[in-house]
Amino acid sequence: MVVGILGTKLGMTQVFEAETGKAIPVTVVEAGPCVVTQIKTEQTDGYTAVQIGYGEAKNKTRQLNTKEPKEVNRYLTNAQEGHLVKSGGTPLRYLREYRVDNTGNFELGQQIKVDLFEAGQLVDVTGKSIGKGFAGYQKRHNFRRGPMAHGSKNHRLPGSTGPGTTPGRVYPGKKMAGHLGNVRVTTRKLKIVRIDPERNLLLIKGSIPGKSGTLISIAPANIVGQK
């Protein structure tokens, strides 16, 4: 695997192809700049990886209700602050780790920017999906509804949930109504349409998980059979 970049989803718009004039729906992501905060090696951690940080943590404090009240950072713990001091940068709110084969190309404090990618490249985008609250069987699992005729008593019910006396219970994992969305989701093999290095913007074809303002992780596509 290779290192990726963190960013913020700004919203959607459209761009036009120069040759055909065809409109392409794109999502605009403000990606980076990120800072390398830790380098893991086989000798120290048992595997090779690069940790990057994104988004400067605001200098806001909160008071701990301890025997001796004290002020601490609202967004970072003491352990996180101490960890970030080693990289020599400003306190960063979000940290992510990417497995890499070789860490020789990275150093603490190094900046990761959108020039890591190129137009036309395929990427995997990870983010938290939009929460939709409590949802029924049709909306959550795409169940087929029952007949809508006057005599039907099963319009949007699930049907059977399992056997009867034996086992006398509903098996774990049964698809039922419940909370929908607000989970970590990865959309794979999306195409980068344009890159704006001056404004740290990536224009990615199609939609990506989350609403505007969502933290997004973008990494080169993990295609089966290719390194």
Swiss-Prot record:
GO terms for biological process: translation. It comes from the Bacteria. Residues 144-166 are annotated as: Disordered. NCBIfam families: L3_bact. One of the primary rRNA binding proteins, it binds directly near the 3'-end of the 23S rRNA, where it nucleates assembly of the 50S subunit. Belongs to the universal ribosomal protein uL3 family. This is Large ribosomal subunit protein uL3. It comes from Trichodesmium erythraeum (strain IMS101). The lineage of its organism: Bacteria, Bacillati, Cyanobacteriota, Cyanophyceae, Oscillatoriophycideae.
